[in-house]
């Protein structure tokens, strides 16, 4: 029996407290940076408790996820640069979240004026505007250094005391607005507590993180197996990074993940007919998630292939299909309605409106006319774009370990390989007999077709409203958009049942275990042990390499 197993619970907790307090005192006396001190104060107790509770955490993916996501997420929120544009369109998300928290007439500060500006980094960064031909990258590379954080935080704290009221008539509730509610809750709480600017900003990030953790945890509870797939997705560096910032992507991906998991959970219980509650667990999260990026609605095609055996009667299945169609039409109208009401004129993507220069010619109506005049030409443009979008190198480089404008961490290729191996291990091995039989050919093909269409429709939208008229390319489709349907691919499309688990254990884990010392062989052949060890390692590597070692 391991020595830690014989210790009482109070003693284990007492040792964890000591592992937090003693390093804090020692590192403070040595004058270490606060980030280094905070990392060890959190990491050492967590590492000790992980060892003490390893059997419980290994056998429960839900607990393992919470045990890893909460401390690493909190550290990421604390280490994040103050400027909100560190994440994709963070300045837009922050302003809307502020307006939700305070209303149309809201109190703003001089610091907010910086955070509302896409180029605010030049105000708080180390390199002034115009210093060189490329002063954007050096500013982001230096923002996490000790000097960079000290200057930025000092500037924000100084300007955060300068307040004035603003009436912004441009704010209006829309379908995408709700995606900023988690951030807004933290800002509202900061106002309620009278928190200083930097703390208020932290609270907005914290509530978004907690909302993401809640959605991922709920998704795991809906499944009989495949929970480790969801755990690995929930701890992907790019997704946790967005959850710790001002972004509506955690809302979108999180609700879609919950909808997908609920759907797969129903398939894993073929003996239980679909109930009203079960249907709502699928349709409500899916709708809330896809509303944020409505052009991705074709990806819901898989919903129509829920097998007849899940319904008590044929009429019940007809009602299910009608409900899915109503959801699809409603979501489609949220982006097609405004476009059609303008007669197809102007821009269909608001980001296109910022591209106003002599070299830019963006007009949806004119673009649509050219597409109708020569549809085969546009079809070729779409095919070429889609093939390029599936280029493995950008996917490897940007989909797993990406912190937006921050410079790439050291060893990021090796780190990315680790994330891919973890996802592959969970996808192939976290399968039970509950996964055998239900992935019918029709369901799998329907899901694949829906996913392909869900990326073609946004591409068409971006061609209409974000790309020059008559261009032979499509702008605006980012690799990170693949995260929307990545959970569906791993949970459903790539489900081979227990066959894949048996193959990996026989051909991969078994041979690896034979090369290890005898005492380690049982753990090396156990999926739960291998997954928990690799997931824990990658979660803490995310903080160490992402925010400490490279500086």
Feature map (PLM): residue ranges:
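Start-transfer (signal-anchor) and selected internal transmembrane alpha helices
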Residues: 2-20, 26-81, 319-325, 438-441, ...
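Transmembrane-helix signature of polytopic, membrane-embedded enzymes
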Residues: 9-16, 63, 195-198, 217-237
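Membrane-interface alpha helices of multi-pass inner-membrane proteins
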Residues: 24, 241, 275-294, 299-305
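Short acidic/glycine- and proline-prone juxtamembrane loop motifs at membrane-interface regions
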Residues: 35, 245-252
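Hydrophobic alpha-helical membrane-interfacial segments at the cytosolic entry of transmembrane helices
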Residues: 67-71, 279-286, 311-337, 445-453, ...
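Interfacial juxtamembrane loops and adjacent helix segments
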Residues: 104-201
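Perimembrane helix-loop-helix junctions
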Residues: 262-271, 297-329
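Membrane-lumen/periplasm interface segments of multi-pass, membrane-embedded glycan/lipid transferases
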Residues: 337-434
């Amino acid at each position: 029996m391991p020595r830690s197993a014989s210790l009482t619970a109070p003693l284990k907790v007492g040792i964890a407290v000591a592992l937090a307090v003693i390093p804090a005192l020692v590192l403070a006396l040595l004058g270490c940076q606060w980030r280094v001190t905070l990392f060890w104060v959190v990491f050492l107790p967590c590492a000790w408790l992980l060892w003490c509770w390893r059997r419980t955490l290994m056998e429960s993916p839900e607990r393992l996820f919470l045990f890893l996501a909460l401390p690493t997420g909190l550290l990421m929120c604390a280490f994040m640069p103050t400027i909100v544009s560190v994440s994709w369109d963070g300045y837009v998300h922050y302003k809307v979240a502020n307006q939700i928290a305070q209303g149309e007439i809201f109190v703003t500060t001089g610091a907010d004026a910086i955070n509302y500006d896409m180029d605010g980094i030049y105000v708080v960064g180390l390199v002034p505007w115009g210093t060189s031909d490329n002063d954007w990258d050096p500013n982001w590379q230096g923002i996490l250094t000790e000097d960079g954080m000290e200057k930025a935080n000092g500037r924000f704290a100084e300007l955060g005391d300068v307040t004035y009221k603003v009436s912004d008539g441009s704010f209006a509730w829309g379908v995408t607005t709700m995606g900023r509610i988690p951030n807004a809750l933290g800002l509202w709480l900061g106002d309620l507590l009278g928190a200083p600017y930097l703390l208020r900003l932290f609270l907005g990030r914290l509530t978004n993180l907690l909302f993401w953790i809640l959605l991922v945890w709920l998704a795991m509870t809906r499944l009989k197996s495949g929970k480790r797939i969801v755990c690995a997705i929930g701890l992907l560096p790019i997704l946790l990074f967005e959850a710790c910032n001002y972004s509506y992507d955690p809302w979108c991906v999180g609700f879609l993940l919950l909808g997908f998991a609920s759907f797969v959970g129903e398939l894993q219980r073929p003996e239980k007919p679909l109930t009203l509650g079960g249907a709502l667990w699928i349709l409500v999260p899916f709708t809330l998630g896809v509303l944020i990026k409505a052009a991705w609605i074709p990806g819901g095609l898989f919903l129509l292939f829920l097998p007849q055996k899940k319904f008590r009667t044929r009429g019940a299945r007809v009602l299910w299909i009608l409900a899915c169609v109503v959801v699809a039409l409603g979501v489609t109208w949220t982006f097609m309605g405004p476009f059609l009401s303008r007669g197809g004129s102007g821009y269909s993507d608001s980001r296109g409106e910022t591209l106003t220069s002599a070299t830019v010619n963006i007009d949806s109506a004119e673009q649509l006319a050219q597409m109708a005049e020569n549809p085969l030409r546009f079809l070729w443009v779409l095919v070429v774009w889609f093939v390029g979008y599936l280029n493995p190198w950008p996917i490897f480089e940007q989909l797993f370990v990406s912190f937006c404008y921050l410079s790439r961490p050291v060893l990021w290729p090796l780190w990315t390989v680790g994330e891919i191996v973890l996802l592959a291990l969970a996808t192939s091995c976290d399968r039970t007999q509950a996964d055998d039989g239900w992935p019918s050919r029709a369901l799998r093909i329907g899901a694949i077709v829906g996913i392909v269409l869900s990326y073609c429709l946004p591409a068409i939208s971006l061609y209409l409203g974000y790309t020059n008229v008559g261009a032979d390319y499509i702008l605006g489709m980012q690799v990170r958009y693949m995260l929307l349907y990545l959970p569906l691919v791993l949970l459903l499309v790539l489900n081979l049942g227990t066959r894949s688990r048996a193959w990996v254990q026989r051909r991969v884990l078994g041979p690896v275990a034979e090369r290890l010392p005898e005492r380690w062989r049982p753990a090396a052949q156990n999926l739960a042990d291998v997954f928990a060890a690799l997931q824990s390692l990658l979660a803490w590597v995310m903080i160490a390499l992402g925010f400490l070692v490279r500086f």
